[in-house]
Amino acid sequence: MAVMVTLTLKTDPATYQSLHEQMLELARPAGLLFHSSYEVGGQVGIVDYWPSEEAWNAFARGPLAQGMKLAKIEPPDDVKVTPLIYADAR
């Protein structure tokens, strides 16, 4: 079942933008369906859509966690995974 993932990255928009393309190159093959971001209080809010919670968890615990550690970004403490009734990217 597809899921919507929301979280706040504990980094500024400039740092996020410098890492954005590298992370998308890893996220797409891992199953990312849609990615969006916005500024919130000097940090970066994320809304992503994934094909399943398992796909999200594999990415979050692997490439995302490693990338954040290398960039010295603290893990988000507000991750919310919401199962979707329907998702259509057309």
Place the predicted regions along the sequence by residue.
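Short S/T/G/P-rich N-terminal loop/turn motif that feeds into the first structured element of a domain
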Residues: 1-62, 66, 72-90
